[in-house]
């Protein structure tokens, strides 16, 4: 009986340690991913797209819906990609599951890319079951989260990133403030208006 009790206690301890290790790994992955997205998404260009001929067209270099976000920004210096870049945050198939990926490539001209075949791809989170993106303009009297950003006059000031993985379930929501890059501030350049503070 003593041997059985000791064996049961050891198994229980091992299971507890495994759960703690999993929780620590999840927290570390969340911290790293959140920090990286804050640094990349936190600086967005307000530059207008070239070739706009209709008031019905989106004048900004931005495409934002519930499953994909495309924007122009700059990669933090420590990652080595200099200059303004097109970025794309979305889900992509990697192996037998989906992953949250960030794709980026140099902005050679102010026109949204039609394809991403030549882009660099970084896998941020693997084994993702669901991704939902929402956008908000904090400068409005009653800001509301929107699954698709359709404004032709303003860029969103915040993005809410919600995702769930197969192993850990739903992550805590990540809210990132999207601030205009120096030189693309519409208040200084006479372009369309951003909401919120600069």
What kind of feature is each model-predicted range?
Residues 1-10:
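N-terminal single-pass transmembrane signal-anchor helix
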Residues 47, 119-135:
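Structured surface patches comprising rigid loops and adjacent beta-strands/short helices at the edges
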Residues 10-109:
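Extracytoplasmic beta-strand-rich oligomerization domains located immediately C-terminal to a leader/signal peptide
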Residues 85-87, 120-122, 170-176:
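Short beta-strand segments
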Residues 90-98, 123-130, 166-167:
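A short, structured loop/turn motif at beta-sheet edges
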Residues 129-198:
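Short linear sequence signals and composition-biased patches located at protein termini or domain-edge surfaces
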Residues 109-123:
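Short aromatic-glycine motifs in intrinsically disordered, low-complexity regions
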Residues 102, 107-112, 189-195:
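A short, surface-exposed interaction/processing loop segment used at functional sites
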């Amino acid at each position: 009986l003593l041997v059985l009790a000791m064996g049961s206690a050891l198994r229980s301890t091992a299971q507890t340690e495994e759960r703690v290790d999993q929780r620590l790994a999840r927290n570390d992955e969340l911290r790293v991913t959140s920090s990286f997205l804050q640094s990349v998404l936190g600086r967005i260009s307000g530059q207008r797209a070239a070739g706009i001929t209709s008031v019905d067209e989106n004048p900004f270099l931005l495409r934002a819906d519930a499953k994909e976000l495309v924007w122009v920004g700059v990669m933090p210096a420590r990652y080595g990609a200099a200059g303004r870049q097109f970025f794309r945050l979305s889900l992509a198939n990697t192996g037998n599951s989906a992953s949250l990926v960030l794709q980026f490539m140099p902005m050679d001209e102010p026109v949204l890319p039609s394809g991403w075949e030549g882009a660099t791809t970084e896998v941020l989170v693997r084994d993702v079951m669901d991704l939902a993106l929402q956008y908000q303009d904090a400068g409005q009297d009653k800001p509301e989260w929107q699954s698709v950003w359709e404004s032709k006059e303003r860029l969103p000031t915040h993005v809410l990133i919600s995702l769930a993985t197969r192993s850990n379930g739903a992550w805590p929501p990540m809210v990132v403030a999207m601030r205009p890059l120096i030189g693309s501030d519409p208040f200084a350049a006479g372009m369309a208006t951003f909401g919120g503070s600069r």
